[in-house]
Amino acid sequence: MANHLQFNFQDATSPLMQELVKFHDHSLTILFFISALILYVLMMTSLSKLTNKNILDSQEIEMVWTVIPAFILIMLALPSIQILYLMDEIASPDITIKTVGHQWYWTYEFSDLSKESEIESYMLPTADLQNGDFRLLEVDNRISVPMDSKIRMLITSEDVLHAWTLPSMGIKVDAVPGRLNQVTFSSSLPGLFFGQCSEICGANHSFMPIAMEVIPLKTFESWIIKLSL
């Protein structure tokens, strides 16, 4: 989860987020070299006393400043397109969960199980927090998903626009009334991950957290059995 004075991403817990972090580093590396080159040229130009006012055009220079930017754009576009296709890929899921946004809480429906189950997830008030709980992030009912499994999340809203977001997994999906948006993800690491509604949805928008536990498959099966009782 996020820390105080943090300027970087949260630790990546899904293949998608790992690719996004790699692309971020790749882009910043290119931008660093471009900025360094421009700064060097500006300094050399401002400090140099050599000038030539007779040069009106140069085919060689025009070719260079056309080819090099095109090459840089290709270096940025190829990994970006790969990630876009990865985000839209819908593989055969192991489990499907329907997420519905409300003002101002979430509901999760497990409809493809032998017995349909549903949980409501509200933020815990500050007065109900225990030692070690996180203010404005803890909920009364956490959603659990199995580790190393393909999860398909169907996301919609009952009232206004919301956005279901888990930064550590690189997920941000709009919850739109009357429409189902979907996303697939998986996590290779167990743990507790937090997110929040990322679309302004009213007075209590800031009090609409998301808490997801990634647990081993056997533990998830036990959790589902208890949920169905």
Swiss-Prot record:
Membrane topology, Mitochondrial matrix segments: 46-59
Lipid bilayer topology: Multi-pass membrane protein
Residues that hold Mg(2+) according to the record: E199
Gene3D superfamilies per record: 1.10.287.90, Cupredoxins - blue copper proteins (2.60.40.420)
Essential cofactor(s): Cu cation
Cofactor stoichiometry and binding remark: Binds a dinuclear copper A center per subunit.
Entries under Pfam families matching the protein: COX2, COX2_TM
Keywords: Copper, Electron transport, Magnesium, Membrane, Metal-binding, Mitochondrion, Mitochondrion inner membrane, Respiratory chain, Translocase, Transmembrane, Transmembrane helix, Transport
A GO CC term attached to the entry: mitochondrial inner membrane
Reaction catalysis annotation: 4 Fe(II)-[cytochrome c] + O2 + 8 H(+)(in) = 4 Fe(III)-[cytochrome c] + 2 H2O + 4 H(+)(out)
Spans within the Mitochondrial intermembrane topological domain: 1-14, 88-229
Superkingdom to which the source organism belongs: Eukaryota
GO BP term, pick one: ATP synthesis coupled electron transport
Transmembrane feature ranges: 15-45, 60-87
Annotated localization: Mitochondrion inner membrane
Binding site for Cu cation A1: H162, C197, C201, M208
Record EC number: 7.1.1.9
UniProt binding sites for Cu cation A2: C197, E199, C201, H205
GO molecular function: copper ion binding; cytochrome-c oxidase activity
Function recorded in the entry: Component of the cytochrome c oxidase, the last enzyme in the mitochondrial electron transport chain which drives oxidative phosphorylation. The respiratory chain contains 3 multisubunit complexes succinate dehydrogenase (complex II, CII), ubiquinol-cytochrome c oxidoreductase (cytochrome b-c1 complex, complex III, CIII) and cytochrome c oxidase (complex IV, CIV), that cooperate to transfer electrons derived from NADH and succinate to molecular oxygen, creating an electrochemical gradient over the inner membrane that drives transmembrane transport and the ATP synthase.
Oligomer status and interactors: Component of the cytochrome c oxidase (complex IV, CIV), a multisubunit enzyme composed of 14 subunits. The complex is composed of a catalytic core of 3 subunits MT-CO1, MT-CO2 and MT-CO3, encoded in the mitochondrial DNA, and 11 supernumerary subunits COX4I, COX5A, COX5B, COX6A, COX6B, COX6C, COX7A, COX7B, COX7C, COX8 and NDUFA4, which are encoded in the nuclear genome.
Similarity remark: Belongs to the cytochrome c oxidase subunit 2 family.
UniProt-recorded name of the protein: Cytochrome c oxidase subunit 2
UniProt source species: Myxine glutinosa (Atlantic hagfish)
Gene responsible for this protein: MT-CO2
